[in-house]
Amino acid sequence: MRTLVTGGAGYIGSHMSLELLDAGHSVVVLDDLSTGRAAAVADAASFVRGDVGDQALLRRLLEDNGVEAILHFAGSIVVPESVANPLAYYLNNTVKSRALIEMAVATGVRYFVFSSTAAVYGMPGSAAVAETAPLKPLSPYGSSKLMTEIMLADAARAHALTYVVLRYFNVAGADPLGRAGQSTSRATHLIKVACEAALGKRSHLDVFGTDYPTPDGTCIRDYIQVTDLARAHSAALAYLSAGGASDTFNCGYGRGFSVLEVVEAVKRAAGHSFDVRLGARRAGDPARIVAASEKLRHNLGWVPAYADLDVIVRQALQWEDRLAAAQP
């Protein structure tokens, strides 16, 4: 299948490109390199540096390459940044997604897989979160993604386009073959930041909040390995190409780990301790958010291969070692 991967020079998009190429699909990557790295783009993919909101460029790419499916990863993802600068998030995540959806419709793209987020649920209760849970985003980031979900659903109802929305929980780890990993500067993902602290790339790791209603007082999250996530996208694409109806799926394992459990896993992988500083809560952090993933497993036949926190952490730490070795 001929595919366009937006944000394909970023963390998840680069893994998706590898997954598609490994399966024999053709891949065009569109990325403005605002946070991505050209070096992260797979050699076998065609790379175009540009803005996902540039409709003239989009039309040319989609028509010239006969694109049948779009996998849309491009966007901004830092929750506190979205609170400080909400209009930038509505531009980058919502307005530009609208431009992409419009060009998909105009050029006859058949399938659209959208990278959304568990942030659309806001602060759910203690139970695993199903796709039918109330949508109450707490940040402009979550709202910007939910708005795109709504636009995509409305466009699909009006046109010959089918889609899958995938709501990610906490993505972590690296390609098992060492071809890709998270290279984002100023990263905020816990596992990456903890690995950086373990390797001395950071002076310490901050833990925000130790008084949550959880067994050890720290937040609990559902961590999904990035290659497993890419394979969920491949399963979504196969589902759509087989005639599946538009739908939405959570992407997580259905099991949560606390911040301190993650810290201990990083210490085990590194073989030593590092400076961990316990601090106050951050506003808007749910105590616990874990995916109900039965729908993804049942409807798309998704079977994760790396659902083990120690495996995920080892991959992330090995990737950080590679990044350190590559520094001049």
What are these language model-derived features?
Residues 1-174:
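N-terminal Rossmann-like NAD(P)+-binding domain of SDR-like oxidoreductases, especially those catalyzing
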Residues 8, 36-38, 50, 80, ...:
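Glycine-centered small-residue hotspots that permit tight backbone geometry or close packing
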Residues 38, 169-190, 200-221:
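Short, flexible, glycine-rich and Lys/Arg-enriched loop motifs at helix boundaries
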Residues 90, 138-146, 180-192, 222-223:
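Short-chain dehydrogenase/reductase
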Residues 97-98, 146-153, 191-192, 227-231, ...:
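Conserved active-site helix of classical SDR/Rossmann-fold NAD(P)-dependent CH-OH oxidoreductases
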Residues 193-328:
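C-terminal substrate-binding subdomain of Rossmann-fold SDR/epimerase-dehydratase oxidoreductases
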